[in-house]
Design a protein with these regions (language model features):
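Two-component system phosphorelay core
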Residues: 1-57, 61-115
Length: 115
Protein backbone atom coordinates (compact mmCIF):
# COMPACT_ATOMS: atom_id res chain seq x y z
CA UNK A 1 0.00 0.00 0.00
CA UNK A 2 1.36 3.43 -0.91
CA UNK A 3 1.30 6.35 1.48
CA UNK A 4 -1.43 8.06 -0.53
CA UNK A 5 -3.51 4.86 -0.56
CA UNK A 6 -3.09 4.53 3.19
CA UNK A 7 -4.38 8.07 3.70
CA UNK A 8 -7.37 7.33 1.45
CA UNK A 9 -8.10 4.13 3.40
CA UNK A 10 -8.24 5.98 6.72
CA UNK A 11 -10.09 9.08 5.55
CA UNK A 12 -6.95 11.17 5.99
CA UNK A 13 -5.85 14.44 4.44
CA UNK A 14 -2.91 13.37 2.28
CA UNK A 15 -2.79 16.62 0.32
CA UNK A 16 -2.85 18.74 3.47
CA UNK A 17 -0.13 16.79 5.25
CA UNK A 18 2.06 16.90 2.14
CA UNK A 19 1.67 20.70 2.09
CA UNK A 20 2.66 20.97 5.78
CA UNK A 21 5.54 18.50 5.92
CA UNK A 22 8.66 18.55 3.73
CA UNK A 23 8.48 15.18 1.92
CA UNK A 24 6.62 11.90 1.51
CA UNK A 25 9.48 10.09 3.27
CA UNK A 26 9.14 12.44 6.24
CA UNK A 27 5.35 11.90 6.37
CA UNK A 28 5.78 8.13 6.10
CA UNK A 29 8.38 8.05 8.88
CA UNK A 30 6.20 10.06 11.27
CA UNK A 31 3.02 8.23 10.32
CA UNK A 32 4.70 4.92 11.18
CA UNK A 33 5.83 6.35 14.53
CA UNK A 34 2.13 6.61 15.37
CA UNK A 35 2.21 2.85 15.96
CA UNK A 36 4.46 3.47 18.99
CA UNK A 37 2.49 6.46 20.30
CA UNK A 38 1.02 5.67 23.71
CA UNK A 39 -1.76 8.27 23.81
CA UNK A 40 -4.54 5.85 22.76
CA UNK A 41 -3.55 3.06 25.20
CA UNK A 42 -3.21 5.69 27.94
CA UNK A 43 -6.64 7.07 27.06
CA UNK A 44 -8.25 3.65 27.20
CA UNK A 45 -6.61 2.82 30.56
CA UNK A 46 -7.58 6.18 32.03
CA UNK A 47 -11.21 5.76 30.98
CA UNK A 48 -11.29 2.25 32.44
CA UNK A 49 -9.84 3.65 35.69
CA UNK A 50 -12.36 6.53 35.67
CA UNK A 51 -9.43 8.99 35.71
CA UNK A 52 -10.81 12.05 33.93
CA UNK A 53 -7.69 14.29 34.10
CA UNK A 54 -5.42 11.59 32.64
CA UNK A 55 -8.06 10.70 30.04
CA UNK A 56 -8.25 14.35 29.00
CA UNK A 57 -4.46 14.65 28.60
CA UNK A 58 -4.31 11.43 26.56
CA UNK A 59 -7.26 12.42 24.36
CA UNK A 60 -5.77 15.89 23.83
CA UNK A 61 -2.42 14.38 22.83
CA UNK A 62 -4.10 11.91 20.46
CA UNK A 63 -6.11 14.73 18.91
CA UNK A 64 -2.97 16.80 18.32
CA UNK A 65 -1.01 13.94 16.80
CA UNK A 66 -3.91 13.14 14.47
CA UNK A 67 -4.25 16.77 13.43
CA UNK A 68 -0.53 17.06 12.67
CA UNK A 69 -0.50 13.83 10.66
CA UNK A 70 -3.73 14.55 8.79
CA UNK A 71 -5.55 11.55 10.27
CA UNK A 72 -8.84 13.44 9.95
CA UNK A 73 -11.27 10.56 10.47
CA UNK A 74 -9.62 9.86 13.84
CA UNK A 75 -9.06 13.53 14.68
CA UNK A 76 -12.79 14.35 14.56
CA UNK A 77 -13.97 11.87 17.23
CA UNK A 78 -10.79 12.40 19.28
CA UNK A 79 -11.52 16.13 19.28
CA UNK A 80 -15.13 15.58 20.39
CA UNK A 81 -13.95 13.32 23.22
CA UNK A 82 -11.28 15.83 24.24
CA UNK A 83 -13.85 18.60 24.52
CA UNK A 84 -16.19 16.39 26.56
CA UNK A 85 -13.36 15.57 28.97
CA UNK A 86 -12.10 19.16 29.20
CA UNK A 87 -14.46 19.90 32.10
CA UNK A 88 -12.84 17.26 34.28
CA UNK A 89 -15.66 14.73 34.18
CA UNK A 90 -16.26 11.58 32.18
CA UNK A 91 -19.75 12.69 31.09
CA UNK A 92 -20.34 11.46 27.55
CA UNK A 93 -17.10 9.49 27.35
CA UNK A 94 -18.98 6.19 27.18
CA UNK A 95 -20.61 7.23 23.89
CA UNK A 96 -17.72 9.28 22.49
CA UNK A 97 -14.94 6.74 23.03
CA UNK A 98 -16.19 3.89 20.75
CA UNK A 99 -15.84 5.95 17.53
CA UNK A 100 -12.31 6.92 18.62
CA UNK A 101 -11.43 3.27 19.19
CA UNK A 102 -12.95 2.22 15.87
CA UNK A 103 -11.03 4.83 13.87
CA UNK A 104 -7.84 4.16 15.83
CA UNK A 105 -8.02 0.47 14.89
CA UNK A 106 -8.58 1.41 11.26
CA UNK A 107 -5.51 3.69 11.27
CA UNK A 108 -3.34 1.05 12.94
CA UNK A 109 -4.42 -1.63 10.44
CA UNK A 110 -3.66 0.66 7.49
CA UNK A 111 -0.28 1.68 8.92
CA UNK A 112 0.66 -1.97 9.35
CA UNK A 113 -0.07 -2.49 5.65
CA UNK A 114 2.16 0.48 4.86
CA UNK A 115 5.18 -1.02 6.63
Amino acid sequence: MTLEQMYAAIGGDYKGVMERLPSADFVRRFALKFLQDDSFPNLKKALEAQDAPTAFRAAHTLKGVCQNLGFDALYVPASALTEALRGGTLDGADTLFPPVEQEYQRVVAALKELE
